[in-house]
């Protein structure tokens, strides 16, 4: 589990406990299911669990099909195009837009944006926001997909720094920025004197990086509470009306890395 998952799950467990709900984590993902009693979807299919919160979403997600076919209540954490599903999300377009605009406003003209896998809707939206923020500015603005772990972010940043010296790295995840910090320091550069770094998430460890990382914040607690509230209402058979989609806006927290 990433640090993002740890923080989000902490709040989900806390609010679920307040609603007297028990939480089971499942190893199944958008591509496959484990069809034995160790998996949450086995419990769902056999009437031993009441609902689901999905913490990731891709187009044509097998889990969504499974849940819809069986009429099982579920909430997706993520922005979705399907009006028939209930979702809670950070405004990922605005994450990219806000981060890009902030760095341009700070005077950076060569920015490398490191994001995770392209197949995730959240990453596509962040890239679109970043492109819209930087599209009318003079400079170099590159998108680097595949930075979905600390090590991969390190390797991508290292590869960039072997060829170029950007003004700033915008990293889609504070934890992954650890790898970027290492690559910058190994290349003999200083943060932020030579190269700035902006992260996303505002996870607690960001305060312990040196220098402390500037980040695009997301309100984990409010989003977790909304996920549990909506799922509880669905389980109870309540009509949500126009409340099927909840989107939370991010904000930039400026620290020493920019």
Region locations from a protein language model:
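Alpha-helical recognition/docking segments in bacterial nutrient-uptake
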Residues: 1-101
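Short acidic/polar active-site loop segments enriched in Thr and Asp
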Residues: 50, 108-110, 166-167
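Short acidic capping loops at alpha-helix termini that bridge into adjacent secondary structure
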Residues: 109-111, 138-141, 191-197
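Flexible loop/turn connectors
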Residues: 158-258
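Glycine-rich phosphate/diphosphate-binding loops that line cofactor/substrate pockets in enzymes
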Residues: 100-111
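Alpha-helical structural signal in soluble globular domains
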Residues: 11-15, 66, 70, 125-137, ...
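Hinge/beta->alpha junction and helix N-cap segments in small-molecule ligand-binding domains
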Residues: 1-7, 25-35, 88-98, 114-156, ...
């Amino acid at each position: 589990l990433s640090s993002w998952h740890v923080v989000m799950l902490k709040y989900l467990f806390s609010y679920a406990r307040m609603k007297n709900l028990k939480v089971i984590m499942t190893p199944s993902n958008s591509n496959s299911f484990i069809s034995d009693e160790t998996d949450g979807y086995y419990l769902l299919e056999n009437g031993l669990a009441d609902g689901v919160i999905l913490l990731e979403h891709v187009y044509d997600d097998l889990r969504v099909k499974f849940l819809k076919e069986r009429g099982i209540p579920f909430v997706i954490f993520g922005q979705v195009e399907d009006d028939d599903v209930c979702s809670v999300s950070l405004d990922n377009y605005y994450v990219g837009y806000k981060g890009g605009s902030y760095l341009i406003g700070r005077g950076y003209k060569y920015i490398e944006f490191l994001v995770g896998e392209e197949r995730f809707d959240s990453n596509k939206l962040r890239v679109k926001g970043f492109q819209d923020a930087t599209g009318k500015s003079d400079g170099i603005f590159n998108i680097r997909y595949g930075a979905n772990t600390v090590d991969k972010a390190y390797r991508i940043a290292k590869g960039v720094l072997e060829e170029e010296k950007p003004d700033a790295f915008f990293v889609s995840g504070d934890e992954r920025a650890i790898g970027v910090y290492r690559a910058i320091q190994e290349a003999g550069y200083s943060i932020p004197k030579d190269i700035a770094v902006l992260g996303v998430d505002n996870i607690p460890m960001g305060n312990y990086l040196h220098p402390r990382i500037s980040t695009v914040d997301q309100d984990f607690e409010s989003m977790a509470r909304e996920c549990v509230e909506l799922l509880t209402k669905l389980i109870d058979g309540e009509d949500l009306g126009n409340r099927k989609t909840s989107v939370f806006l991010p904000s930039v927290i400026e620290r020493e890395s920019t």
